[in-house]
Each structure stands twice: as structure tokens, then as C-alpha cells.
Amino acid sequence: MTTRQHTVCVIGAGPRGLSVIERLCAAARAAAPDTAIGIHVVDPHAPGAGQVWRTSQSAHLLMNTVAGQISVFTDASVELTGPLEPGPSLHAWAEALLAGDIPGHYPDQVLDEARALGPDTYPTRAFYGHYLRWAFDRTVAGAPDCVTVTWHRSRAVALDDEAVALATGHPPRQRVTLEDGEVLEHLDAVVLSQGHLPARPTAVEEQFAALAREHGHTHLPPANPADTELECVQPGQPVLLRGLGLNFFDYMALLTTGRGGSFTRVYGRLVYLPSGREPRMYAGSRRGVPYQARGENEKGPHGRHEPLLLTPARIARLQAARGTDGADFQRDVWPLVAKEVETVYYRTLLTARGRGDRAESFQRAFLRALPGTSAEETVLDAYEIGEKDRWDWDRLSRPYQDQEFGSPEDFTAWLLDHLREDVAEARSGNVSGPLKAALDVLRDLRNEIRLVVDHGGLHGDSHREHLDRWYTPLNAFLSIGPPASRIEEAAALIEAGVLHIIGPDLRVDVDRQGFHAHSPLVPGSRISAEVLIEARLPDITLSRTEDPLLRRLLDSGQCATHRIATRNGTWIYTEGVAVTPRPFQLLDAARRPHPRRYAFGVPTESVHWVTAAGIRPGVNSVTLTDSDAIAQAALGAVLEQRDSLERTAA
């Protein structure tokens, strides 16, 4: 073994950083067993879980993916360059834990959850954190003899080239400075694998927050609910939550069951029993209704919709267009996505009606019919699918569009019916239920859509207007929602008078008396509150980042925002960190790739699409293929440095 140790630094040790570390260990075992390699892991929180999945968070916070569809390990489906070294999914780990096959002592709460956990159960985030910490420990314990892993419980604040390259003509090695003053030197490669990061507010947001402070009101900015101090919210106090997505459900849980309330069933109906410590919650958003519930999983851990139209051949044709000739999402991609979703809906509807024998012939006929033409209507008529059962994207995205509300009571009555219907649809499953089977196609097609839109696959105007501002929020609303249990709980809280949904197109202002909100579509909906919670995560924004490392890299020209060419030859600048295609080398302000720096994950959103999605087993997870590519490149930098030094010494 070489006596000089070569080093890689991984900054950010949540699931993505963990995956890179695991892939580095696997690659070193196969390709460099005689080369001493040190892996520095930099994260102020325990590696594996990181901050978001830390084990100390409230047990009232749930994941929105079932246990059988969560992993951090490679499997036979993953198209790897490096070696395959499989490991258990979260559900398989829970089973092994109960069987006594997982070493270590775990709290009773963890063991109790493992006993209750099925493959289609939504685990707590803390439970996932225990799995991730175990996965890190397993990776370190099983690392080849040539690899040592060192955790630095601190935050990286600077990344620089070393002043002198050790070998002539070789790029300088790297130096990382930590918040506690420690300096990591002579690094052959650095991987940025951070997650959601704090961001400065926009000018409009800061003006609003300043007004709130001036009048002495409590304004809680966008944040992970697990990181938010809620002691300032008093029992019985009116509190306004702006946002009805996943963060809203987290706050809803923390302020109700998290304060001692409970749910029970009375004649089959869920009822909330208050503790008396809850605030009075008012909530709203532009769309005005909570995210759609996930359909109960009937696909097992690995099942997914196989593309009918977004096939590899079609994707290859779309990928051939780049830059100013990039694809147009609305013209080239959306019709294919919509057609796939609608086809699955109608096919499942026929099967649910007992006409499964006609489903295949329907699919062939419907796929041949051009979208939005009378040919589609003819097919639907031929298969006796009436108007009331026909797919309507507008009605799905704005389910209240045909309603008129005379009062908040009218809106609440309609909303409760809507929520109960959503729960019933979710209970029917993501294979058997026509609606949820169709909406699950949006989730299953994420990898295919990424292949088209990533790295400037769309022209800039389409990326901004069609993908960022239209499809991404629609996709989140329809397919990245909470478990059905959360929707049922929201309905019970509304009936208990603890939660009030204000209505669509939420308007909020602030004055000396407090925060005021109303829906222009719901007469009499104006409410006032003393506390406003922004129920969303901070923006993914490089230009306004408060992460000290990215801030310094940006200010010094060592990184840049991703840009996309428009049809008229100009650029649209996004808020994502600019990187090359795989292996995602960091680009500087002059758009030059750095041969020793790599970045992937949430901060690169807009280069990549939906970067927050987790690793799923059995479906060739893009996160695993990405981390494998980075690990191969980082190991390549190590071996190149080793060979160069050996040549110099000779």
C-alpha cells in the first residue's frame, strides 16, 4: 500500500453525501485496494441522517414515502460504473432490527415503530434517521483496509485551491476551512452534497417581515418545521399558516398531536380530541386547497408505470435538441406526460367497471388519437366513458373552479366533501383506483422527465414559464402529497374547530393590529392573527444563500448560477449552482469546470429537476447513478494524483 494518504472531502452528510461515501468505499475496494485513501466527512450533524433526518426530531413528523420504497443502497436495477454492493431498504432494515441482526442498542420507541412498520407504512422521519445513521456506520465499518473515514462535526466555510500544485501541470489540490478553525489540506477531490440551505428573504419578503417586527407581531420565516421554535405560539392564539403543502401538514401535526391532542374513531369517523394547548389555526395558499393525498401503495417496493410514450427512443430525440434549440415543455413534453396519465386513468376505470377485457384495446385506440382532438372523444364515446367520468386537468388543479361560495361556511362544507373524497380515492389505491393510479404516473415518470429537462434540455423561456412556474407546482400538488391519514386528520381538525382553511388566492397584509388574510373567492373570509408562519421551505437560491461556503464561492467567482439559453440567444439565469453534466464538476464564474470539485443535490435545482426526491430501490434511482458517477470521478482524481507523484518520485 502507498504510504502517502490521498484524500477526498464530502461536505454534507445526509442521504446524498452518504451515498457518495458508500460508492467511494465500493470503488476503492475494487479499483484501488493498495492506495491509502482518507475520506473527510464534514457536517455539524450526525452523518447519514444529517440535519433534516436527525433522530432527535418529533415523532409526529412523517415521511411521505412508504418504507418499502426507501433505500440508500445500490441494487441490480441501478446502471452502475462502480461495483454493486447491495443493502437493505428501510423496511428490510426494520425487519432485521427486530430479528436481532442489527447491532447496537435502540430506544423502545424505535423498536415499537419497527414492529408496527409494514412495507406500505409511512415511517417517521426520526426512524429513517436511525436507518441512515446505521447505514453510515455499516459503510465505515465495512470500508476496505485502504480507506479511513473521519467525521468533522463542523461546517465548511471556505474552499480554495492550494497555492502550489504538487506536480507540474497538475491542477492544485484543495483546502477546506471549517467553522471551528480546522483546515483540511491536500485534498484530491471535494464533493458538495448539501441539502436545503438557509436563504436571505427577497426584498418584498424582507419588507413584509420588517413591518411585522415594527408592529411587534411574530413572523416565522420559511424553514424546516422541525427546526422552528413554536413555543411562541400560545394556546388558543390565532395563527396564520401561509402554504398548504407538505410543510403545512408538519406544522398541523406539531401544533395538535404534538401538543397532546389525539385522534379517535367514532362510528368509523375520525374525530379530534383537543388537549386545550392548540392555537386556532387559519391556513391558505394561492391554490387554496391542501395537496392531494398519495394513493395507498399497491405496487410493492419496486413497481412503477412503464412509459408508453416517454420511451428511451423518444427521450433521445428530445435530448438531441439543446441550447437555443432546446425542447419546449408545453409543446414537446407535456402532451406525452398528459397522454400517459389519461391513458392509465381510463384503462384503470374500465377495469374497475369490470371491463378489463377492453382495457388493452382501449389503450391502443386512445394512444393513436391525437391529444385534444375529436378522435379522442370518439374513442371515449366508443368505450362508453361519459362526460362526468372524463379526465379534466383544470378541475384537478383547481377543484373549486365551478363553485360559488356565499360564505366561509359554504367553502368549508365544500372543502370537507372534497377532502373526504380525496381520502376515499387514496384508499382505493395507486393501481386499482383510477384517479390515484393516474396521478402516480406523474411520480413514476420523474426520471424520464429529468432526462429531457436537465442540463438545458428545454430552451430558457420554456424552462422558466412551463417547467418552473407551471408544471413543477402542479406536479407537487397532484403527486407529492401527504399520506391519506394526514388529509383525514385535517378534515377532523376542521370539524373540531381547530383548523380553518381560508380559501383560494390567499391575500395577506399586516398592520398595527396584526396579520390579516382573506380569499377574494370567499365572501366574509377575512381573519386576523397575531402570528404568521410561512409554511414552506426556504427558496433554493444561490444568489441569496446564507450558507457561508456557497456564499464565499459565489462572491469570489469560484461558482456561478446555472444559465439556460433562450430562443432569442439571451440567457435566463436560474438560482441553481452551475455544474457540468456527469460527474457534475463545479463551474466558476467564467463557466470553467473545476477538475477537483463536484456538486449535486438540492443546491443544483434547475440544472437538475426535483432534486429533493429520495432514493428508491429497484427503479434505477438517478441519485444512485449520480453518486456513483461522482465517486468514480473523485477516485479517478485520487489515482491520477497518485500516479503523478509516483512518476515524479521515480
UniProtKB/Swiss-Prot annotation:
InterPro entries on file: FAD/NAD-bd_sf, HpyO/CreE_NAD-binding, L-asp_N-monooxygenase_NS-form
Cofactor: FAD
MF term (GO), any: monooxygenase activity
Keyword vocabulary terms for this entry: Monooxygenase, NADP, Oxidoreductase
Enzyme Commission no: 1.14.13.248
Pfam families membership: NAD_binding_9
Catalysed reactions, semicolon-separated: L-aspartate + 3 NADPH + 3 O2 + 2 H(+) = 2-nitrobutanedioate + 3 NADP(+) + 4 H2O
Descriptive protein name: L-aspartate N-monooxygenase (nitrosuccinate-forming)
UniProt source species: Streptomyces davaonensis (strain DSM 101723 / JCM 4913 / KCC S-0913 / 768)
